[in-house]
Regions:
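Core catalytic region of metal-dependent phosphoesterases/phosphodiesterases
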Residues: 4, 8, 13-81
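Short hydrophobic-aromatic micro-motifs
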Residues: 7, 61-62, 111, 115-120, ...
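Divalent metal-coordination and catalytic microenvironments
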Residues: 10, 38, 53, 64-65, ...
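Active-site environment of divalent metal-dependent phosphoester hydrolases
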Residues: 12-17, 41-43, 67-71, 110, ...
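Well-ordered beta-strand scaffold positions
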Residues: 38, 113-115, 201
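Active-site neighborhood of divalent metal-dependent phosphoester bond hydrolases
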Residues: 46-117, 124, 130-150
Length: 215
């Protein structure tokens, strides 16, 4: 079987569901996994997810807003964590020196050739080198508040050269725009963990084993 690139939605510590998904797609030695970010917080196994991505070169991820929050906190910035981030911070902070180098290394964007991977979004009409880290980790809509769920979705307007694979904004099914596909289908909220296989254009998903977060 030819090697495949499997892009998965927000994990949020849902390690068991990731294993279920990899079993479903018959993940092989020559395949790779790219996550759209938010490896950590909210779910039960952030440590296991981080350990996997740090130890196996087949796994990579872009920076999500929750990953960024822990990175900033553990690097000594005086930021206030969200309630949903505090349990993971408390559980892992004694080992933060082990995880900080990896979190520091996460890129905000990965170019897969035919596709781009980013956590939240890209602002239409803005060159890649001019996209802000805030937009790449927080963007939902094109109104005054980038994080708003009520404004015009960025992916309805985006029409770049490459298809963007993103997460951050959970929905029951993958969000599909002109040149963008959203893969956060709310696993941590009891819904599904979804993936897109670059080479075949297939969507795959598995159900959450339980509801981990109600926020």
């Amino acid at each position: 079987m030819a090697s495949r690139t499997i892009v998965v939605g927000d994990l949020h510590g849902c390690y068991d569901e990731l294993m279920d998904l990899l079993n479903q797609v018959a993940f092989g030695a020559d395949d790779r996994v790219v996550c759209v970010g938010d490896l950590v917080t909210k779910g039960p196994k952030s440590r296991e997810v981080l350990d996997l991505f740090m130890s196996d070169q087949r796994f990579s991820s872009v920076m999500g807003n929750h990953d960024l929050a822990l990175r900033r906190k553990w690097n000594g910035e005086k930021i206030k964590l969200k309630e949903s981030q505090k349990p993971t911070h408390k559980a892992l902070k004694k080992d933060k020196q082990h995880y900080v180098p990896y979190l520091n290394s996460l890129p905000f964007l990965i170019d897969l050739g035919s596709h781009l991977v980013v956590h939240a979004g890209l602002r239409p009409g803005v060159e890649l080198h001019s996209q802000t880290t805030e937009d790449m980790t927080e963007l939902r809509s094109l109104g005054k508040d980038r994080a708003s769920r009520n404004g015009p979705p960025w992916y309805d307007e985006y029409d770049g050269d490459k298809v963007v694979l993103f997460g951050h904004w959970p929905a029951p099914e993958p969000r599909v725009g002109k040149k963008a596909i959203g893969l956060d289908t709310g696993c941590v909220y009891g819904h599904r963990l979804s993936a897109f296989i670059i080479e075949t254009g297939e969507f795959k998903s598995v159900p959450a084993r339980e509801t981990y977060d109600l926020t």
